[in-house]
């Protein structure tokens, strides 16, 4: 579905400009603060950005633990003394200082945290901690690689991997039967224009196939049943 801005631009730039054509343009997308909700129970309602902000503001916070109670004043003090220090560095230093405190020094803050937790339990009896989901999940580096003939070749090599079967005659002569398209010891050519990472992956895949064949051969050859 085209946006409102692109539809307006197409109408104004056309040679046959007609003001009546503006009436056929849908009103969706006029404001960037309007968000469409996919919830079927909302009956196709429009939700503004202010309402979404309000739902975030109404989120119940977790009760403070002993470390948070202690670090409130310490964080302000350290931020005033070191205005150029980042918040992450302040948190690291506060965590290190908290570990250096004795149990007797930490005990008053544990008591304060227990009181806050009791008050929080009375105010929100049905409260359940729900961690926030990360908006951007880290993706695997392999999925970021662009597809080229070399990567497809690696996939074909893995798909064509087959186990070698051996049949023994009475005179213990071994005959090998392979269903692989490429002969053993010869790997398919790799595209020279591919990236070094993909060439390494193809080489690693070929080595794995050779190791499988060697291991299977050794298992059948050393088996006492066929000796």
Swiss-Prot record:
Belongs to the SRY family. Interacts with CALM, EP300, HDAC3, KPNB1, ZNF208 isoform KRAB-O, PARP1, SLC9A3R2 and WT1. The interaction with EP300 modulates its DNA-binding activity. The interaction with KPNB1 is sensitive to dissociation by Ran in the GTP-bound form. Interaction with PARP1 impaired its DNA-binding activity. Residues 60-128 bind DNA. Its main location: nucleus. This is Sex-determining region Y protein. Keywords: Activator, Calmodulin-binding, Cytoplasm, Differentiation, DNA-binding, Nucleus, Sexual differentiation, Transcription, Transcription regulation. InterPro entries: HMG_box_dom (IPR009071), HMG_box_dom_sf (IPR036910), SRY (IPR017253), SRY-related_HMG-box_TF-like (IPR050140). Transcriptional regulator that controls a genetic switch in male development. It is necessary and sufficient for initiating male sex determination by directing the development of supporting cell precursors (pre-Sertoli cells) as Sertoli rather than granulosa cells. Involved in different aspects of gene regulation including promoter activation or repression. Binds to the DNA consensus sequence 5'-[AT]AACAA[AT]-3'. SRY HMG box recognizes DNA by partial intercalation in the minor groove and promotes DNA bending. Also involved in pre-mRNA splicing. Pfam families: HMG_box. It comes from the Eukaryota. GO terms for molecular function: calmodulin binding; DNA-binding transcription activator activity, RNA polymerase II-specific; DNA-binding transcription factor binding; RNA polymerase II cis-regulatory region sequence-specific DNA binding. GO terms for cellular component: cytoplasm; nuclear speck; nucleus. SUPFAM superfamilies: HMG-box. The gene is SRY. It comes from Callithrix jacchus. Disulfide bonds: none annotated. Transmembrane segments: none annotated. It is found in: Nucleus speckle; Cytoplasm; Nucleus. SMART domains: HMG. Residues 23-56, 170-205 are annotated as: Disordered. The keyword Membrane does not apply. The keyword Transcription applies. Residues 25-56, 170-180 have a biased composition (Polar residues). One of its GO terms (biological process) is sex differentiation.
């Amino acid at each position: 579905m085209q946006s409102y801005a692109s539809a307006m631009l197409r109408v104004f730039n056309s040679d046959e400009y007609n003001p009546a054509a503006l009436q056929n343009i849908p009103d969706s997308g006029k404001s960037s603060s309007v968000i469409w909700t996919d919830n079927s129970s909302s009956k196709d309602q429009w939700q503004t950005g202010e309402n979404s902000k309000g739902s975030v503001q109404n989120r119940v916070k977790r009760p403070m633990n002993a470390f948070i109670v202690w670090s409130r004043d310490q964080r302000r003090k350290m931020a005033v003394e070191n205005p150029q220090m980042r918040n992450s560095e302040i948190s690291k230093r506060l965590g290190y200082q908290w570990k250096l405190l004795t149990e007797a020094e930490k005990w008053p803050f544990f008591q304060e945290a227990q009181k806050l937790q009791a008050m929080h339990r009375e105010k929100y009896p049905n409260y359940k901690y729900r961690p926030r989901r990360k908006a951007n999940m880290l993706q695997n580096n392999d999925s970021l690689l662009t597809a080229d003939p070399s990567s497809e070749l690696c996939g074909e090599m893995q798909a064509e991997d087959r186990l070698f079967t051996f049949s023994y005659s009475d005179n213990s002569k071994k005959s090998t039967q392979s269903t692989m398209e490429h002969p053993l010891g010869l790997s398919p050519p790799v595209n020279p224009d591919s990236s070094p990472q993909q060439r390494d992956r193809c080489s690693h895949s070929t080595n794995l196939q050779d190791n499988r064949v060697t291991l299977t051969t050794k298992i059948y050859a050393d088996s006492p049943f066929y000796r």
